[in-house]
Amino acid sequence: MENDRQAIVVWMNHLKQVRSLKRFGNVHYVSRKLKYAVLYCDMAEVEDISEKVSRFHYVKRVEMSFRPFLKTEYESKKEMMYEHKNEDVQISI
């Protein structure tokens, strides 16, 4: 039973309040130089959490990750070339 998770990137003015983000999900990474934190939460709650987090005075902006919507399984080039050759042979017959 695996939950679908999505990352939320929270850009902040100060990193002092990073600990307060723990109640919204799992804080995966914090960049001290660029002042942002990556927060993982359930996909069903992403909209609500991003609205709540963006209301804090120390938050500059909130961005959602598009990784769950990207294709991560790729076909090899050889398989694609083999399929194209087979199609060409069938068309010529």
From Swiss-Prot:
Xref: HAMAP family: UPF0298
Coiled-coil annotated residue ranges, if any: none
Record family assignment: Belongs to the UPF0298 family.
Keywords: Cytoplasm
Protein name per UniProt: UPF0298 protein lwe2074
Origin species: Listeria welshimeri serovar 6b (strain ATCC 35897 / DSM 20650 / CCUG 15529 / CIP 8149 / NCTC 11857 / SLCC 5334 / V8)
GO cellular component: cytoplasm
InterPro entries to which the protein is assigned, alphabetical: DUF2129
Domain of life: Bacteria
Subcellular location: Cytoplasm
